[in-house]
Amino acid sequence: MRAWILLLAVLATSQPIVQVASTEDTSISQRFIAAIAPTRTEPSAASAAAAAATATATATATTALAKAFNPFNELLYKSSDSDSDNNNNNYKNRNNNNNNLNKGPRNNKNKGNKHSKSDANRQFNEVHKPRTDQLENSKNKPKQLVNKTNKMAVKDQKHHQPQQQQQQHHKPATTTALTSTESHQSPIETIFVDDPALALEEEVASINVPANAGAIIEEQEPSTYSKKELIKDKLKPDPSTLVEIENSLLSLFNMKRPPKIDRSKIIIPEAMKKLYAEIMGHELDSVNIPRPGLLTKSANTVRSFTHKDSKIDDRFPHHHRFRLHFDVKSIPAEEKLKAAELQLTRDALAQAAVASTSANRTRYQVLVYDITRVGVRGQREPSYLLLDTKTVRLNSTDTVSLDVQPAVDRWLATPQKNYGLLVEVRTMRSLKPAPHHHVRLRRSADEAHEQWQHKQPLLFAYTDDGRHKARSIRDVSGGGGGGGGAGEGGKGNGGGRNRRHQRRPARRKNHEETCRRHSLYVDFADVGWDDWIVAPPGYDAYYCHGKCPFPLADHFNSTNHAVVQTLVNNLNPGKVPKACCVPTQLDSVAMLYLNDQSTVVLKNYQEMTVVGCGCR
């Protein structure tokens, strides 16, 4: 009977009715009663016991009433969509000062007919699952019993709304409730206004936090690529850029135009290939060619010349004496000759001679002369100037190298007096002519051209073009090293600060922005020079780029002046600029190519690649 009276009292009031989605749960009845309770004062122990007993009896009566015929079944089984629309309409009507408070429930009734009772019960059970985290938070808050119950009622009602509508109405509902000054407010609205903790929770819940907000971002390492990857993935420059690159390289190579040659008709001597490999730092097992030009440490160019056949050669019919002629006009006049050597290849002796024990023990003497004056038949003998002599054995030496620098110097000074060289082979015991052909000047009839190219006599001229600069004190002493950590592969301690054990540079989080060496690969095929440049096909020039932060660490390979400049810039940026990231040490690149006269040239170009970077 008390339950019927309670429901009639609710219908008689002019305030909005808080709708309950289901009456089969006794906790919902308790929330319903607590929501419409007119008082908020803390009840005494006796009052609390009486209220609990009354609530239990009321809940039992309400449950029994819901199972029987009830004219308010449609109202009690309204869907969550109608509840959300009802609340939204109530808020809008209140902001517009609309006193028609019964319009919302009437509209909700029409919308509620679209949903079945089974769907409403299923959705109601899914929404009202126990929330352990909310109950634990509510226990820690020192609030009144009524406020706790009302807060749960508000949350249950808000959970009826779909997720998208709930996110859209979070902020408008909060603003409307906080700014509303009307006197007609339901108990739920009053609780919503007076509970700041609930409003704070709604604002926090409305913030969208990315899923990876707490993830740790690992430090990215600088990208490194192999030379094959750089060649494969590099961008082709436009034609105008190619012309500029070609002009710059021609100026660097001291050429007016690229040589036009037929590469198929030229064979690179094996001696030049070995010399190139040795200069590039490769270890070779059998290299017994003296290189006097390299001992000067200033020759940066090596040229090879082959023997030019002439009718004069017929005047030397004997196998132990022969004439060699080399055309050295292709050597520029501005280059200074540092050394010159003659390389002779000895043919294998006959099997009978090799098998002879005495022949294996026999030593031979090779002599080379500069023909300073030709002879006239019947009038005068030719004049010779002994240049060098070498002693060789049959079973030990395959090549013979002789120093002929005085003769080449005379040829460069007076080209018209280049009469060639005279080579003579004798035995050491009797100083008689050697009985076997040790050196050949012409290709045999049954010998391939390529085989003869590797065996023919060669003249090597070592010159210096004077374009390279003298090494500084820092480079010679090793203090100008490769830039340490700033140079990526540089050698030496760097910065002139020689230390026995230099500590490893500190790793920066954004180390790509600091001064360091970057890759810059130059491919000769891009400018169409791969037809006359034998080796290498390209090279990595590198470049320096990055910031010089304050304070300058040791691995930045900085000078004392750069340290002072950085300090002054940090104190007064407008007075002096920051230190710049520049190359601190450069290295040379050896190139093997062909010139216009089809001469094989091995040139060591100075300051072509960056070894270390630093702040200067």
UniProtKB/Swiss-Prot annotation:
User: Which cysteines share a disulfide bond?
Assistant: 515-581, 544-613, 548-615
Region described as Disordered = 80-188, 470-512
The annotated regions of Basic and acidic residues compositional bias extend over: 116-139
Q: CDD domains given for it?
A: TGF_beta_BMP2_like
Please list the residue ranges that the record marks as compositionally biased, kind Gly residues.
477-496
Q: In which tissues is it expressed?
A: Expressed in the imaginal discs associated with establishment of the proximal-distal axis of the appendages, and midgut mesoderm.
Q: Where is the composition biased (Polar residues)?
A: 173-188
Q: Which organism is it from?
A: Drosophila pseudoobscura pseudoobscura
Which keywords does UniProt give here?
A: Developmental protein, Differentiation, Disulfide bond, Glycoprotein, Growth factor, Secreted, Signal
Q: Which residues are glycosylated?
A: 147, 360, 395, 557
**Per the record, what is one GO cellular component?**
extracellular space
| Location relative to the cell | Secreted
- Propeptide residues, per UniProt? 24-474
Domain of life of the organism in this record? Answer: Eukaryota
**Skewed-composition ranges (Low complexity):** 86-105
Compositional bias (Basic residues): 106-115, 497-509
Main localization of the protein described in the UniProt heading: secreted
Q: Which residues form a coiled coil?
A: none
Signal peptide region: 1-23
Show the PROSITE patterns listed in the entry.
TGF_BETA_1, TGF_BETA_2
List the Gene Ontology MF annotations in alphabetical order. cytokine activity; growth factor activity
Q: What's this protein's function?
A: Acts as an extracellular morphogen to establish at least two cellular response thresholds within the dorsal half of the drosophila embryo. Required for the proper development of the embryonic dorsal hypoderm, for viability of larvae and for cell viability of the epithelial cells in the imaginal disks. Acts together with scw.
Recorded protein name is: Protein decapentaplegic
- GO BP term (any one): cell differentiation
